[in-house]
């Protein structure tokens, strides 16, 4: 019996050995996956963290400018709000979009370690955006008749026209700020951008106080302060770049930057259209709401929801930047699988944050609403939109990240067509039908634009991303990098 027991124990021990090996392998694989997730998270947040800070501080320049103008009077506040949101806002989103061409080119070049191309890309972007800024000057010069044509009261339109002319220096600063911002971002020098934005904001607050309360320059003083702050930001980043901060990627000004401008313009334009179609879509939501019967309450409630949504969008837009850089870097390095992994990590983390924020907004909207209005009627209207606002925030936690994948992969033209179709041929008509034909008012307009536009666009982007052949995209990135290289341009 003893011998049989020993044999049985021996058999059991032998049977346990492969099980233990499998368990050890599984534990090792688990550990490797956790390590990979942690490493990718660190790389992602090295971009996302400073990007959130930068976006908040640059947007605060506009907010603080309006706040100082608001203390001068209702007319001044209305005029500078129109200039910031309509005149400057139109061009601001266009330049942001056009500068994302650098995220594709510089991001992939950085991954491929072809650093000599960076400086030429940056200079080409400066040239293209500067030419576009000249073409857009009539919007500032003829702001008064444009605003009157749009139905603005004469006094607001007249003052807005004067402010717009004084805002021209800010307009030109965008042509230099956004390209150099993307240039540094693709090299993971995000802390430099954040420091520059923080310094500019502090200076902006001080100069605003000086111009408005000490020198008593009025509303012109507030917009002049914005000019100082934006150009200070450009000066800091330009000095850092050209004075040794980027030794590998900046080798001085080059005549090569004047070559292949038409191809660069087409890529920049498709990037600009992709971003603008989305930005203008939400601006149209406010315009459409203004045509409802109880327009004042509806516009106020929708404006509050858009303000909350705009502040929350700083997070997914930072993930947009982080995703585009990470995907572009990995594709440029020929790592299709790692680009896919970077996309999954970014979407997952942004979605988790989006779920948390959307739930908090849903339950705390009453308290948050008091920050914007003390009117019980307006707050009740805002509360009625809580479900739509929460759902919009949830969708926005995914959609910009997928757009970042598109930018990192160079799909701007495709996404521009998707945005056009989803937003303006599906979402907008559906919003009109639900708002007016079915008498759902502002809830119908917004629901139609969310489910018909944003949701359909998000589903299409998810489908495209899931079907993507990442190894093929890595090959495409290699071809693109070689095509745009300085050495090729010289041949």
Curated annotation (Swiss-Prot):
Keywords (A to Z) from UniProt? Membrane, Transmembrane, Transmembrane helix, Transport
Principal place where this protein is found?
Answer: membrane
What are the disulphide bonds in this sequence? none
Transmembrane feature ranges: 47-67, 77-97, 127-147, 160-180, 192-212, 228-248, 272-292, 302-322, 352-372, 387-407, 414-434, 444-464
Q: Does the keyword Transmembrane helix apply?
A: yes
Membrane topology category:
Multi-pass membrane protein
Q: Name one GO molecular function term.
A: antiporter activity
- InterPro entries, per the entry: MATE_euk, MATE_fam
Location comes to: Membrane
GO biological process, alphabetically ordered? xenobiotic detoxification by transmembrane export across the plasma membrane
Q: Give me the Gene Ontology terms describing cellular component.
A: membrane
UniProt similarity note: Belongs to the multi antimicrobial extrusion (MATE) (TC 2.A.66.1) family.
- Report the protein name in the record: Protein DETOXIFICATION 28
Origin organism is Arabidopsis thaliana
Ranked from the top, the taxonomy reads: Eukaryota, Viridiplantae, Streptophyta, Embryophyta, Tracheophyta
Gene that produces this protein: DTX28
């Amino acid at each position: 019996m003893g011998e049989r027991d020993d044999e049985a124990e021996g058999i059991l021990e032998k049977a346990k050995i492969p099980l233990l090996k499998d368990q050890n392998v599984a534990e090792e694989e688990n550990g490797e996956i956790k390590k990979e997730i942690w490493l990718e998270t660190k790389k992602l947040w090295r971009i996302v963290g400073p990007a959130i800070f930068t976006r908040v501080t640059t947007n605060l320049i506009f907010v603080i400018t309006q706040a100082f103008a608001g203390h001068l009077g209702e007319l001044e506040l209305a005029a500078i709000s129109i200039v910031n949101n309509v005149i400057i806002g139109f061009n601001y989103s266009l330049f942001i979009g056009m500068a994302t061409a650098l995220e594709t080119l510089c991001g992939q070049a950085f991954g491929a370690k072809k650093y000599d191309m960076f400086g030429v890309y940056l200079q080409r972007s400066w040239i293209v955006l500067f030419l576009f800024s000249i073409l857009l000057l009539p919007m500032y010069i003829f702001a008064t008749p444009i605003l009157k044509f749009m139905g603005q009261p004469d006094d607001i339109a007249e003052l807005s026209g004067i402010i717009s002319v004084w805002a021209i220096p800010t307009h030109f600063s965008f042509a230099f700020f956004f390209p150099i911002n993307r240039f540094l971002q693709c090299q993971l020098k995000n802390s430099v951008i954040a420091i520059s934005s923080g310094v500019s904001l502090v200076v902006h607050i001080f100069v605003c106080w000086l111009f408005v309360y000490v020198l008593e320059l009025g509303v012109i003083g507030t917009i002049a302060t914005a000019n100082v702050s934006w150009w200070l930001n450009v000066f800091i980043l330009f000095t850092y770049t050209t004075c040794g901060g980027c030794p590998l990627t900046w080798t001085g000004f080059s005549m090569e930057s004047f070559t292949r401008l038409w191809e660069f313009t087409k890529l920049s334009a498709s990037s600009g259209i992709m971003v603008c179609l989305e930005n203008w879509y939400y601006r149209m939501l406010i315009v459409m709401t203004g045509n409802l019967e109880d327009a004042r309450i509806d516009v106020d409630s929708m404006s509050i929801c858009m303000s909350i949504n705009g502040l929350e969008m700083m997070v997914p837009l930072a993930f947009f930047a982080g995703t585009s850089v990470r995907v572009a870097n990995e594709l440029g390095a020929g790592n299709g699988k790692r680009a896919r992994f970077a996309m999954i990590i970014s979407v997952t983390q942004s979605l988790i944050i989006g779920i948390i924020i959307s739930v908090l907004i849903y339950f705390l909207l009453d308290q948050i609403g008091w920050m914007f209005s003390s009117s019980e009627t307006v707050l009740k209207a805002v509360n009625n939109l809580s479900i739509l606002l929460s759902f919009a925030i949830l969708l926005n936690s995914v959609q910009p990240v997928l757009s970042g994948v598109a930018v990192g992969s160079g799909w701007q033209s495709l996404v521009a067509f998707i945005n056009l179709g989803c937003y303006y041929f599906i979402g907008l008509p559906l919003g009109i039908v639900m708002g007016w034909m079915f008498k759902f008012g502002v809830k119908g307009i917004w629901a139609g634009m969310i489910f018909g536009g944003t949701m359909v666009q998000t589903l299409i982007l998810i489908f495209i991303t899931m079907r993507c052949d990442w190894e093929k995209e890595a090959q495409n990135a290699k071809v693109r990098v070689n095509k745009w290289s300085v050495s090729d341009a010289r041949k």
